[in-house]
């Protein structure tokens, strides 16, 4: 049993911060003397982690969006390198965030010889597949959340365990539609569409105008239609609300609680990312949107090698849920699809049945072990 071991954990985005915090809570409950520090956000801080930096506030993606924050990221990288060199932890846990974490893994292994677990694999199956060579050289154990990733790493000779997807357990605890509406103060018998534009500033700027116009078109045919918009903690609520002002729409804004908002809805329009998988695991009728800068889009067309953007479609290897991307991401296309979807009684049932099968494939009952057990197995035995 580990005693007074030192662990450093690095999670640079809000979703990773949340997942990492759940692990820390489990570890602290069993090993209260465990010293845990690193990079994270409000969830890791609340779990008792001593934070060196918080990068979750700078939620950016794409080639052009990251430029204004490069100085901040460079400083955080230097700070965590210094921290690792000083602390020499028994275990380094890297959570997602590959552009930052793979560079850190190379330094931590080559310069310091640290033991490293990487939780939530880089999407090497989508782009930059050659990163698997760096992973093989630097990572002691991959903890993957998709079953097919295990096969990829096994074939490359990388130690790997499938630990189940963290969202499955989270979704299992979610309220049903009726309870969610009651909790959020939403009417029980009126049609509701949830609008999830994303958690990054660039996503808000590109997606919200499209969602507002989509909502206006939909209400022309369905005047009683209501909308609920959960606002991510990384976004200024006033900025989101300003887009909807004076638009003659019935909109409820909720701080956070994205899962509850999706559960309360009859249909969800969601930006590609973690929320789209949450929606799929809720077995909720949905469509996926995404619009990036032109430069990012061109780069993606050149480098990304998968057929789909939505995680549920990637996992199913088919277009289970429609994707409206870049130039197809517009109010006319979206409103037309949603209207046709609800006028065809077989479509919602078919989508829900397919999503239920996907959910089962990701459950922890199919996992090799839990992330907690994997981490504990890698911690050293120490004398009291």
From Swiss-Prot:
One of its GO terms (biological process) is lipid A biosynthetic process. It holds the Pfam family LpxB. It comes from the Bacteria. It is an enzyme of class 2 (transferase). Keywords: Glycosyltransferase, Lipid A biosynthesis, Lipid biosynthesis, Lipid metabolism, Transferase. Pathway: Bacterial outer membrane biogenesis; LPS lipid A biosynthesis. One of its GO terms (molecular function) is lipid-A-disaccharide synthase activity. InterPro entries: Glyco_trans_19 (IPR003835). It catalyses: a lipid X + a UDP-2-N,3-O-bis[(3R)-3-hydroxyacyl]-alpha-D-glucosamine = a lipid A disaccharide + UDP + H(+). GO terms for cellular component: membrane. Its EC number is 2.4.1.182. Belongs to the LpxB family. Condensation of UDP-2,3-diacylglucosamine and 2,3-diacylglucosamine-1-phosphate to form lipid A disaccharide, a precursor of lipid A, a phosphorylated glycolipid that anchors the lipopolysaccharide to the outer membrane of the cell. This is Lipid-A-disaccharide synthase 1. It comes from Legionella pneumophila (strain Lens). The gene is lpxB1.
């Amino acid at each position: 049993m580990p005693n007074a071991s030192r662990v450093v954990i690095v999670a640079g985005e809000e979703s990773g911060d949340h997942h990492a915090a759940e692990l820390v809570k489990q570890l602290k409950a069993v090993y209260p003397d465990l010293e845990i520090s690193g990079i994270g956000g409000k969830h890791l801080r609340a779990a008792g982690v001593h934070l060196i930096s918080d990068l979750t506030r700078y939620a950016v993606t794409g080639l052009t969006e990251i430029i204004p924050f490069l100085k901040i990221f460079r400083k955080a990288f230097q700070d965590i390198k210094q921290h690792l060199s000083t602390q020499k932890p028994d275990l380094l846990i890297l959570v997602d965030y590959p552009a930052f974490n793979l560079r850190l893994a190379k330094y931590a292994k080559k310069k310091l010889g640290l033991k490293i677990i990487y939780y939530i694999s880089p999407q090497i199956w989508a782009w930059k597949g050659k990163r698997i060579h760096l992973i093989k050289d630097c990572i002691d154990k991959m903890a993957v959340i998709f079953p097919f990733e295990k096969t990829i790493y096994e074939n490359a000779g990388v130690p790997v365990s499938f630990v189940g997807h963290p969202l499955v357990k989270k979704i299992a605890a979610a309220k049903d539609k009726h309870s969610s509406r009651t909790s959020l103060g939403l009417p029980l018998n009126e049609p509701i569409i949830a609008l999830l534009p994303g958690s990054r500033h660039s996503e808000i700027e590109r997606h919200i105008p499209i969602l507002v116009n989509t909502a206006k078109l939909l209400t022309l045919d369905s005047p009683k239609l209501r909308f609920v918009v959960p606002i991510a903690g990384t976004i200024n609520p006033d900025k989101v609300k300003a887009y909807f002002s004076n638009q003659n729409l019935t909109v409820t804004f909720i701080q956070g609680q994205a899962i509850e908002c999706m559960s309360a809805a009859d249909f969800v329009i969601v930006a590609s990312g973690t929320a789209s998988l949450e929606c799929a695991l809720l077995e909720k009728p949905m469509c996926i949107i995404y619009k990036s800068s032109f430069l990012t889009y061109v780069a993606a067309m050149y480098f990304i090698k998968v057929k789909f953007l939505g995680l549920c479609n990637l996992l199913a290897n088919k277009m289970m849920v429609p994707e409206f991307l870049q130039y197809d991401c517009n109010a006319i296309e979206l409103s037309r699809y949603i209207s046709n979807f609800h006028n065809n009684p077989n479509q919602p049932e078919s989508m829900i049945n397919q999503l239920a099968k996907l959910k089962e494939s990701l459950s922890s009952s199919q996992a090799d072990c839990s992330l907690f057990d994997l981490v504990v197995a890698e911690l050293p035995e120490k004398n009291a």
